[in-house]
Amino acid sequence: MKRLLTLAWFLACSVPAVPGGLLELKSMIEKVTGKNAVKNYGFYGCYCGWGGHGTPKDGTDWCCRMHDRCYGLLEEKHCAIRTQSYDYRFTQDLVICEHDSFCPVRLCACDRKLVYCLRRNLWSYNRLYQYYPNFLC
């Protein structure tokens, strides 16, 4: 997940319009948690950002581990998790996925589970893990 958010940040800053779910994920994180997705979660712990290994550092990192596994299941179903875009609405604090085809709706569901988990675990967020080095995982 570390690389995923890093790539989202890069794409968001350098390309005006980008296909794929990375920008949707970034937007969803920011709407639900109120935190900057890249700065706060792009390099957090052992699992937030691209890839991940080791033991999650706290509740926030466990959310990212769960998200990595959700994406892994979608990859097994041949979903293009890095390029597949999807539509969602954010209404009254709820994320509503708006797709009827298999991969987009499931990708959105993975991201929705992540952001709800991150919101539930805002209390566990520890700045010591914000830019945690991978070699310590």
Swiss-Prot record:
Secretory calcium-dependent phospholipase A2 that primarily targets extracellular phospholipids. Hydrolyzes the ester bond of the fatty acyl group attached at sn-2 position of phospholipids (phospholipase A2 activity), preferentially releasing fatty acyl groups with a low degree of unsaturation such as oleoyl (C18:1) and linoleoyl (C18:2) groups. Hydrolyzes low-density lipoprotein (LDL) phospholipids releasing unsaturated fatty acids that drive macrophage polarization toward an M2 phenotype. May act in an autocrine and paracrine manner. The active site is at H67, D111. Belongs to the phospholipase A2 family. This enzyme lacks one of the seven disulfide bonds found in similar PA2 proteins. Residues 1-20 form the signal peptide. Binds 1 Ca(2+) ion per subunit. The gene is Pla2g5. Ca(2+) binds at Y47, G49, G51, D68. This is Phospholipase A2 group V. Pathway: Lipid metabolism; phospholipid metabolism; Lipid metabolism; leukotriene B4 biosynthesis; Lipid metabolism; leukotriene C4 biosynthesis. GO terms for biological process: arachidonate secretion; fatty acid metabolic process; leukotriene biosynthetic process; low-density lipoprotein particle remodeling; negative regulation of inflammatory response; negative regulation of T cell proliferation; phagosome-lysosome fusion; phosphatidylcholine catabolic process. Keywords: Calcium, Cell membrane, Cytoplasmic vesicle, Disulfide bond, Endosome, Fatty acid metabolism, Golgi apparatus, Hydrolase, Lipid degradation, Lipid metabolism, Membrane, Metal-binding, Phagocytosis, Phospholipid degradation, Phospholipid metabolism, Secreted, Signal.
